[in-house]
């Protein structure tokens, strides 16, 4: 378990040091946007990797393989649409994220059942959970 915690700390440090990968010339034209696109231009300094240009997303920026894709709490992030899917989760290694298409009535049922089973729900605040549990 200590190895897992060490890798989670390493993942956090790597994330803090990782630059924001922005599209080439994103600042020149607002319609382009900042979302990452790999530069392919023949004379592109960014593609070549000149030091005074923005960073290019490469394999070296990836986090540790064992903790890649996990929630910062260390749990797997599982999308849940109903109570049946929630019951199938393992609370020790998995946490729930309620789908955006779920309505309020079913959301309340899911939060109550998750509290009963000891499953963490990532996208419901503590205040909302308390409010749902009191209903």
From Swiss-Prot:
GO terms for biological process: translation. GO terms for cellular component: cytosolic large ribosomal subunit. Keywords: Ribonucleoprotein, Ribosomal protein. It comes from the Archaea. InterPro entries: Ribosomal_eL32, Ribosomal_eL32_arc, Ribosomal_eL32_CS, Ribosomal_eL32_sf. GO terms for molecular function: structural constituent of ribosome. Belongs to the eukaryotic ribosomal protein eL32 family. HAMAP family: Ribosomal_eL32. This is Large ribosomal subunit protein eL32.
